A protein has these predicted regions:
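Conserved Nudix-box catalytic region and its N-terminal flanking loop in Nudix hydrolases
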Residues: 16-54
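Acidic surface patches and DE-rich sequence motifs
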Residues: 13, 24, 75
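Nudix hydrolase/Nudix homology domain
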Residues: 28-31, 102-161
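Conserved N-terminal beta-strand and adjoining loop/helix that marks the start
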Residues: 1-18, 37-39, 69
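Unchanged
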Residues: 38-62, 71-125, 159-161
Length: 161
């Protein structure tokens, strides 16, 4: 079973929550917070800072959290993913999109009241925890677990455990 660790960042400004548009292999685009796979030997925060800068041009100078951790297993597709989500307490730089992986095609601060609508096109395991955090702004770390059934992204069924 393929396993990987992903870091995800919650960056807020007066304009809202930072979301990036990801062009998937099938050509579809969905929105998520910035982040990505943590390289072997990297700490989550080092890898997450790298991903945020690569995808958005912003440099995080202080982290809080983790806000939540997520565990998702897709037995049919043969993968297991762990996600650690941190809040950027402070950051600098100008927002720009220049993703070396070519996945991120847009980035913007989305007003908080619009986040649920923008995130509706992405997986439940992405938008559900973010929607809950935006609504509640909890302090203590939370944990989420999901099972993903099926082996084709477009028809996978996601269940919160």
């Amino acid at each position: 079973m393929r396993q990987w660790l992903v870091g995800s960042a919650l960056l807020e400004s007066d304009d809202g929550l930072l979301l990036v548009a990801n062009r998937r292999r099938d050509g579809n685009v969905d929105w998520t917070p910035p982040g990505g796979v943590i390289d072997d030997g990297e700490s989550v925060l080092v890898g997450l800072a790298r991903e945020v800068e690569e995808e958005t041009g912003l440099v995080v100078t202080e982290w809080g959290g983790p806000v939540y951790r997520l565990d998702a297993e897709a037995v049919d597709a043969g993968w297991h993913m762990q996600v650690e989500v941190h809040r950027a307490v402070a950051f600098t730089g100008e927002l720009r999109v220049d993703d070396p992986d070519g996945i991120v095609v847009d980035a913007r601060f989305v007003p908080v009241e619009e986040c649920s609508a923008v995130l509706a096109s992405t997986w439940q395991l992405v938008h559900e925890p973010i929607a809950e955090w935006v609504a509640e702004r909890w302090v203590d770390e939370r944990r989420y677990r999901y099972r993903v059934d099926g082996d084709v992204r477009a028809s996978m069924v996601i269940t919160r455990l």
